[in-house]
A protein has these predicted regions:
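Short, charged, low-hydrophobicity "junction" segments
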Residues: 1-8, 108-111, 134-138
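A short, N-terminal "cap"/entry segment at the start of jelly-roll beta-barrel domains
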Residues: 1-23, 142
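Alpha-helix N-cap/helix-start motif at coil-to-helix transitions, marked by capping-box chemistry
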Residues: 18-21, 102, 126-133
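N-terminal regulatory/effector-sensing and dimerization cores
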Residues: 19, 26-119
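Regular secondary-structure segments
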Residues: 55, 133-147
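Short, solvent-exposed positions on alpha-helices
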Residues: 70, 148-152
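Aromatic/histidine-rich interaction motifs
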Residues: 114-137
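Single conserved hydrophobic/aromatic residue that forms the stacking wall/gate
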Residues: 152-163
Length: 163
């Protein structure tokens, strides 16, 4: 299994911050091949937003309850909003590769709405692109270098993720 990630102020704790329009809290990637299973279970969700981009393979999501299983394939993103139930798994047999980013801010809801993300939807088809992977890797690197990611850094690349 390959893991690469970066965290705002090197903190693994989720946070809510309305001091700026958009603040990236963390970003990373997982690539499973031999690792059997990588589960995530957050019954009360998180304080921030999360986007998961499935770059390869597939992932299993349980949006409304732990028993429902929705398979999301490469070329899609999943959007979680604050305090939403989160349960999902990646399996090595699926050769899953995902990129994820957690973010908060005073204008996040408007930014998402302006880019075509309605409030009542979790899954968005965006297609696969090496450009998406490059954008996520750039965010990871900036977080690892302790650079502050502001709206300017994020808004331009997210235009490529627009549905």
């Amino acid at each position: 299994m390959y893991i690469n990630s970066g965290y705002h102020n090197h903190s693994l704790i989720d946070f809510k911050d309305k001091s700026r329009p958009l603040i990236v809290g963390s970003c990373g990637t997982y690539r499973l091949s031999s690792h059997q299973k990588l589960p995530t279970y957050r019954p009360r969700g998180r304080l921030d937003f999360q986007i998961i981009y499935i770059a390869a393979g597939r992932a299993h999501f349980h949006f409304d309850n732990a028993d429902d299983d929705t398979i999301v394939t490469a070329g899609n993103i999943v959007l979680y909003r604050p305090k939403e139930f989160q349960k999902y798994e990646y399996y090595g047999i699926d050769k899953t590769e995902v990129y994820w980013v957690h973010f908060t801010g005073s204008d996040v809801k408007n930014i998402l709405r302006n880019y075509g993300f309605p409030n009542d939807q979790h899954i968005f088809h965006v297609g696969t692109s090496l450009e998406y992977e490059r954008i996520f890797k750039r965010i990871i690197l900036e977080l690892q270098r302790c650079q502050d990611l502001s709206l300017i850094h994020i808004s331009e690349p997210t235009r490529h993720l627009r549905i």
